[in-house]
């Protein structure tokens, strides 16, 4: 049997063809030190070290410096002639620029003689020597030259027209009084600083006006929004918050849809807190520290309803009720309801204080009185009924310069039955007293406290006896009263 052998050749199906990499140019083969410059095409050295290869079609540049007389060490291509001059790339460029400048200098402008030759055709000959034919031929020649000169001119294009500012003030008559160096374009450092300062001030004023305009527009739009919102709330009523009781199926569906629209794009949880903090920071950055106490919740109102009408008072911070309806909040901590009395209950909110049972001002119980006033001493009736003529006034008790302060010994303070002892001040030592005991009493030291104590004991024990015996030794001397007049004492 003949066997058939089938050789399957490998295919490139499913294999990624390798991308041919571009060969990097080889570096220069300079032996004295490593050079990273690429080689010239077909050579082993770069353009800087190509002179190391003697067989390379390069030679040293032919430029010789006029300052130091040295020759340029750069390489230049060999010329076709053996003794030809060849320059490197840099000196060849400089040589071309010099030739171009020299050609401009050698090409002068139009000279006066050439201009006169061009205008000689317009010169008029003498009238006597001219014939009609010559004059006619001269006129036709002038017309031909004019038509030829007109035909030589090319039509003017848009690019060839004058490009100037139509509102330019260069030719204005009103600007003659300005600075002639305004359009010079050259300024000193002080002038540049002054001009830039004026421009910045003008720009700042324009920016401030623009910001004020934007603030006005923002306030106007906010006012319109609040007005439309109020009109909408008055038209819809409080049915959005009280519930769908008493509504038709279609109205309930519309109410549900409206609530969904109101909750759309509303932030909750952490996002709401972060958004509020962002607003507060923006307000502090724009309005300053004066607006720090004003928060975004200042426009929120109380959620309580009185007779199906929502309360218009502002809610307390961090709450949803005002001060009047704070008791409706089940999560309150800083307020309690007043207990009132058993007969008349009271539900007014009262802030929690140090007391355990806070009360409103109407039901507040006063604490017991800590201070007790002293008891007034009872005055006997016989003292109250005493004659008032026996008391001296304050004016009578004041001493004068001419008369000394003296008291009467018969002055009855308590009553007729009790008289005070005589005062030692009543004795005048200047008087000539014939009675030696009285004189000794007036001149000698007197124990006032001892006499008053003895007189008091005598008044308690003897009663009216002392009142009869005490003034006896003083009967012979004159006694001055409170009025300063001496009166004789009488013994009853």
UniProtKB/Swiss-Prot annotation:
Q: Which parts of this chain are annotated as the region Required for interaction with other NSL complex members?
A: 308-364
Q: Where is the composition biased (Basic and acidic residues)?
A: 135-144, 162-182
Which superkingdom? Answer: Eukaryota
An example GO BP is:
chromatin organization
Q: Where in the cell is it found?
A: Nucleus; Mitochondrion
Q: Which residues carry this modification: Phosphoserine?
A: 147, 149, 168, 172
Residues bearing the modification Phosphothreonine: 131
Q: Where is this cross-link: Glycyl lysine isopeptide (Lys-Gly) (interchain with G-Cter in SUMO2)?
A: 78
- One GO term of the cellular component aspect? nucleus
**Expressing tissues:** Ubiquitously expressed.
Q: Which Pfam families match?
A: zf-C3Hc3H
Subunit text = Component of the NSL complex at least composed of KAT8/MOF, KANSL1, KANSL2, KANSL3, MCRS1, PHF20, OGT1/OGT, WDR5 and HCFC1.
> Main role?
Non-catalytic component of the NSL histone acetyltransferase complex, a multiprotein complex that mediates histone H4 acetylation at 'Lys-5'- and 'Lys-8' (H4K5ac and H4K8ac) at transcription start sites and promotes transcription initiation. Required for NSL complex stability and for transcription of intraciliary transport genes in both ciliated and non-ciliated cells by regulating histone H4 acetylation at 'Lys-5'- and 'Lys-12' (H4K5ac and H4K12ac). This is necessary for cilium assembly in ciliated cells and for organization of the microtubule cytoskeleton in non-ciliated cells.
In Swiss-Prot or TrEMBL terms, this protein is called KAT8 regulatory NSL complex subunit 2
Which organism is this protein's natural source? Capra hircus (Goat)
Give the classification, highest ranks.
Eukaryota, Metazoa, Chordata, Craniata, Vertebrata
Question: Encoded by which gene?
Answer: KANSL2
């Amino acid at each position: 049997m003949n066997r058939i052998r089938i050789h399957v050749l490998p295919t490139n199906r499913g294999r990624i063809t390798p991308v041919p990499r571009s060969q990097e140019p080889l570096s220069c083969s300079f032996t004295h030190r490593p050079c990273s410059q690429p080689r010239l095409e077909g050579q082993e050295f770069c353009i800087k070290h190509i002179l190391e290869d003697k067989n390379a079609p390069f030679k040293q540049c032919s430029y010789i410096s006029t300052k130091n007389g040295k020759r340029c060490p750069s390489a230049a291509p060999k010329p076709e002639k053996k003794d030809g001059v060849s320059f490197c790339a840099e000196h060849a460029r400089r040589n071309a620029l010099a030739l171009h400048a020299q050609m401009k200098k050698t090409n002068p402008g139009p000279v006066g003689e050439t201009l006169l030759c061009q205008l000689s055709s317009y010169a008029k000959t003498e009238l006597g020597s001219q014939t009609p034919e010559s004059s006619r031929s001269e006129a036709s020649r002038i017309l031909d030259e004019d038509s030829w000169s007109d035909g030589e001119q090319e039509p003017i294009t848009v690019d060839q027209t004058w490009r100037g500012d139509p509102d330019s003030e260069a030719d204005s008559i009103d600007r003659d009084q300005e600075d002639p160096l305004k359009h010079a374009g050259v300024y000193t450092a002080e002038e540049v600083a002054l001009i830039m300062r004026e421009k910045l001030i003008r720009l700042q004023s324009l920016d401030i006006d623009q910001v004020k305009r934007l603030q006005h527009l923002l306030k106007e739009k906010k006012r319109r929004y609040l007005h439309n919102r109020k009109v909408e709330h008055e038209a819809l009523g409080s049915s959005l918050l009280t519930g769908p009781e008493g509504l038709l199926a279609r109205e309930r569906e519309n109410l549900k849809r409206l609530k969904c629209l109101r909750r759309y794009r509303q932030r909750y949880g952490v996002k709401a807190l972060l958004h509020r903090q962002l607003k507060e920071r923006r307000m502090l950055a724009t309005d300053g520290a004066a607006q720090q106490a004003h928060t975004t919740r200042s426009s929120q109102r109380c959620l309580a309803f009185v007779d199906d009408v929502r309360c218009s008072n502002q809610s307390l911070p961090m709450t949803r009720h005002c001060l009047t309806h704070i008791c409706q909040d089940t999560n309150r901590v800083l307020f309690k309801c007043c207990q009132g009395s058993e007969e008349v209950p009271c539900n007014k909110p009262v802030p929690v204080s140090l007391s355990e049972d806070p009360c409103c001002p109407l039901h507040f119980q006063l604490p017991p009185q800590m201070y007790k006033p002293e008891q007034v001493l009872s005055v006997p009736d016989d003292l109250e009924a005493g004659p008032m003529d026996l008391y001296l006034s304050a004016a009578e008790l004041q001493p004068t310069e001419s008369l000394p302060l003296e008291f009467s010994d018969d002055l009855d303070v308590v009553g007729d039955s009790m008289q005070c002892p005589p005062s030692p001040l009543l004795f005048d030592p200047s008087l000539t007293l014939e009675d030696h005991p009285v004189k000794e009493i007036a001149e000698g030291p007197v124990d006032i406290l001892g006499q008053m104590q003895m007189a008091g004991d005598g008044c308690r024990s003897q009663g009216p006896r002392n009142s009869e015996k005490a003034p006896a030794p003083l009967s012979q001397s004159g006694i001055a009263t409170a009025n300063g007049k001496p009166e004789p004492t009488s013994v009853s």
